[in-house]
Curated annotation (Swiss-Prot):
Naturally occurring in which organism (per UniProt): Danio rerio (Zebrafish)
Compartment annotation: Nucleus; Chromosome
Gene Ontology MF annotations: DNA binding; DNA-binding transcription factor activity; nuclear receptor activity; RNA polymerase II cis-regulatory region sequence-specific DNA binding; zinc ion binding
Residues annotated for a phospholipid derivative binding in this entry: 397-400, 492, 496
Binding site for Zn(2+) 2: 82, 88, 98, 101
Self-association and partners: Monomer; Binds DNA as a monomer.
Alphabetical GO biological process terms: cartilage development; digestive tract development; exocrine pancreas development; hepatoblast differentiation; hormone-mediated signaling pathway; liver development; positive regulation of tendon cell differentiation; regulation of DNA-templated transcription
Domain (NR LBD): residue spans on this chain: 276-515
Name of the protein: Nuclear receptor subfamily 5 group A member 2
Source organism superkingdom: Eukaryota
Main localization, broad class: nucleus
UniProt domain comment: The C-terminal extension (CTE) loop competes with a DNA minor groove anchor of the nucleosome and releases entry-exit site DNA, thereby promoting opening of closed chromatin.
Length: 517
């Protein structure tokens, strides 16, 4: 039996035409990496037009057509004009329509003017030989990483042992309970790590809206057309060529999206090769919620929740923690609904993906908060409180202690890997778009998103952390660990639910029941 929250969501969506076009994106479970077609997607698609590449020409792999076009343009010193607005689409079918935009794209993706011979003889300039060798080596390294980590993840280790005998939780984080009586709490100030592209679906909602099911959407929003452009332009990773940025990257949380689009290629390359910034990563970052706003909303909800209860009906510490996790899950669902790719799925597929990975997204959200902002020896709650880890450990039972210990180990690993916000966002999408979810109507889209995000993450890591040669693989290997912790947390939560310790009207439990159905 599906929980009420799902039936309401599906019923309303069907009443507006089945298609689940609403803001949204999320994560996924056991991460089985397939042998993605990196040869085709990364090595054999011309970055200018998408045609099959024929070899290295003027600085990078391109097709014969773009090679010849670039050579003729440079040798004949041609000057083109664009009759549109200098943003024509260049692909295999219409690459000849606008030579101006085609040539600009050649420069943007990295074809080098200085590689064209002025004497019109055959063959390029020998000084690019070492660069080609390095490029080949990088591509071979990419393939090796993909295959190695694919094998490692296919042979996933057994999930951590769940639910030991001692399931007591003595007084679980007493200081949170006392602090909640007098909220405001000591807020943790979030610095420039947070961007300001507010999700339209979650921005400015009063706390009362958090009581509503996140799946119940107004007829107005359901009737709205899909996001402009939909999935067009995202089908192949080749469409997301790395942008050229002068010097350091602008931080996406303090810069407009436009500021990330880069500078004219030739000018930027004057001082050497700039790093690359996969455009897909920028698009994923735009979906991120504003964390201070989420924090304020959850705090307001908890205040309202406690204030509405009588003196002897106040939630105990564990009840408060459940409410906190419950509201965090609401915000995660809102994030998913407002995210690229996810909103293109029908409602049934959205529900299957969310039911599969909701606990992993909660764990990943918690872990990343610790990596970025928690003080040593403390746990940072979504409400902004720093809680002493030793105090929690001393008051928790064996199972909760085991969970916390595994989570802290994961935090330490990710800190040592220097996990950043861009990588975190990629991991969220890899979890949400799980290849393990069965009976999806649009499995092709899920598979495509996995491939694109994997490729974008790999490019980002290799360009920005070249000294950490195994970072990409190490990041992917954390996904099974997140999965294992989340399954253990689900078992623990279910046990507490059976004992009547979890507050009623809880989205956590509804999702738990839906997953077990």
């Amino acid at each position: 039996m599906l929980p009420k929250v799902e039936s309401e969501y599906l019923g309303l969506a069907r009443s507006h035409g089945e298609q689940g076009h609403m803001p949204g994106n999320m994560q996924a479970p056991q991460f089985k990496m397939m042998d993605y077609s990196y040869d085709e997607d990364l090595d054999e698609m011309c970055p200018v037009c998408g045609d099959k590449v024929s070899g290295y020409h003027y600085g990078l792999l391109t097709c014969e057509s773009c090679k010849g076009f670039f050579k003729r343009t440079v040798q004949n010193n041609k000057r083109y004009t664009c009759i549109e607005n200098q943003s024509c689409q260049i692909d295999k079918t219409q690459r000849k329509r606008c030579p101006y935009c085609r040539f600009q794209k050649c420069l943007t993706v990295g074809m080098k003017l200085e590689a064209v011979r002025a004497d019109r003889m055959r063959g390029g300039r020998n000084k690019f030989g070492p660069m080609y060798k390095r490029d080949r080596a990088l591509k071979q390294q990419k393939k090796a990483l993909i295959r190695a980590n694919g094998l490692k993840l296919e042979a996933m280790t057994q999930v951590m042992q769940t639910v030991p005998a001692d399931l007591t939780i003595t007084s679980a984080i007493q200081n949170i309970h006392s602090a909640s009586k007098g909220l405001p709490l000591s807020h943790h100030h979030h610095h420039h790590h947070h961007h300001h592209h507010h999700s339209s679906s979650s921005a400015g909602l009063p706390p009362a809206d958090f009581d509503r099911s996140p799946f119940v959407t107004s007829p107005v929003s359901m009737a709205m057309p899909p996001h402009a452009g939909g999935l067009q332009g995202y089908q192949a990773y080749g469409h997301f060529q790395s942008r050229t940025i002068k010097s350091e990257y602008p931080d996406p949380y303090t810069s407009s999206p436009e500021s990330l689009m880069g500078y004219p290629y030739v000018e930027a390359y004057a001082g050497g090769s700039p790093p690359s910034f996969p455009h897909l990563v920028v698009e994923l970052l735009k979906c991120e919620p504003d964390e201070p706003q989420v924090q304020a909303k959850i705090l307001a909800y908890l205040q309202q929740e406690q204030a509405s209860r009588g003196k002897h009906e106040k939630l105990n510490t564990f009840g408060l923690m459940c409410k906190m996790a419950d509201q965090t899950l609401f915000s995660i669902v809102e994030w998913a609904r407002s995210s690229i790719f996810f909103r293109e799925l029908k409602v049934d597929d959205q529900m299957k993906l969310l039911q599969n990975c909701w606990s992993e997204l909660l764990i990943l959200d918690h872990v990343f908060r610790q990596v970025m902002h928690a003080k040593e020896g403390s746990i940072l709650l979504v409400t902004g409180q720093q809680v002493d880890y030793a105090l929690i450990a001393s008051q928790a039972g064996a199972t909760l202690n085991n969970l916390l210990s595994h989570a802290q180990e994961l935090v330490s690993k990710l800190r040592s890997l220097q996990l950043d916000q861009r990588e975190f966002v990629c991991l969220k999408f890899l979890v949400l778009f799980s290849l393990d979810v069965k009976n999806l109507e649009n499995f092709h889209l899920v598979e495509s998103v996995q491939e694109q995000v994997n490729a974008a993450l790999l490019d980002y890591v290799m360009c920005n952390y070249p000294q950490q040669t195994d970072k990409f693989g190490q990041l992917l290997l954390r996904l099974p660990e997140i999965r294992a912790i989340s399954l253990q947390a689900e078992e623990y939560l279910y046990y507490k639910h059976l004992n009547g310790d979890v507050p009623c009207n809880n989205l956590l439990i509804e999702m738990l029941h839906a997953k077990r159905a």
